[in-house]
Amino acid sequence: MANKKIRIRLKAYEHRTLDTAAAKIVETATRTGAQVAGPVPLPTERSFYTIIRATHKYKDSREQFEMRTHKRLIDIINPTQKTVDALMKLDLPSGVNVEIKL
């Protein structure tokens, strides 16, 4: 797998679990002899939801909720077969979405 690159995008609602998952991936990749670029923090996606508090009337009384999606990007440069095998067996915390591109 010479001159190849693995790009890993991580998404999570909690930034602490996202950072621990990114640290595990970086530590595993460096331990198996690959070069790592990242984790690079990507812009946080924010979603707002406005809901009427009362059931039938009092439309002026509303409540707003926000949902944030934190993202990180990790590039693994020149991965070996040992690196790929170690990443496949890696156990990441729940709540972290992982997208891998070769």
Swiss-Prot record:
<dbReference type="InterPro" id="IPR001848">
    <property type="entry name" value="Ribosomal_uS10"/>
</dbReference>
<dbReference type="InterPro" id="IPR018268">
    <property type="entry name" value="Ribosomal_uS10_CS"/>
</dbReference>
<dbReference type="Pfam" id="PF00338">
    <property type="entry name" value="Ribosomal_S10"/>
</dbReference>
<dbReference type="GO" id="GO:1990904">
    <property type="term" value="C:ribonucleoprotein complex"/>
</dbReference>
<protein>
    <recommendedName>
        <fullName>Small ribosomal subunit protein uS10</fullName>
    </recommendedName>
</protein>
<comment type="subunit">
    <text>Part of the 30S ribosomal subunit.</text>
</comment>
<keyword id="KW-0689">Ribosomal protein</keyword>
<dbReference type="GO" id="GO:0006412">
    <property type="term" value="P:translation"/>
</dbReference>
<comment type="similarity">
    <text>Belongs to the universal ribosomal protein uS10 family.</text>
</comment>
<dbReference type="InterPro" id="IPR036838">
    <property type="entry name" value="Ribosomal_uS10_dom_sf"/>
</dbReference>
<dbReference type="GO" id="GO:0005840">
    <property type="term" value="C:ribosome"/>
</dbReference>
<keyword id="KW-0687">Ribonucleoprotein</keyword>
<dbReference type="InterPro" id="IPR027486">
    <property type="entry name" value="Ribosomal_uS10_dom"/>
</dbReference>
<comment type="function">
    <text>Involved in the binding of tRNA to the ribosomes.</text>
</comment>
<dbReference type="GO" id="GO:0000049">
    <property type="term" value="F:tRNA binding"/>
</dbReference>
<dbReference type="GO" id="GO:0003735">
    <property type="term" value="F:structural constituent of ribosome"/>
</dbReference>
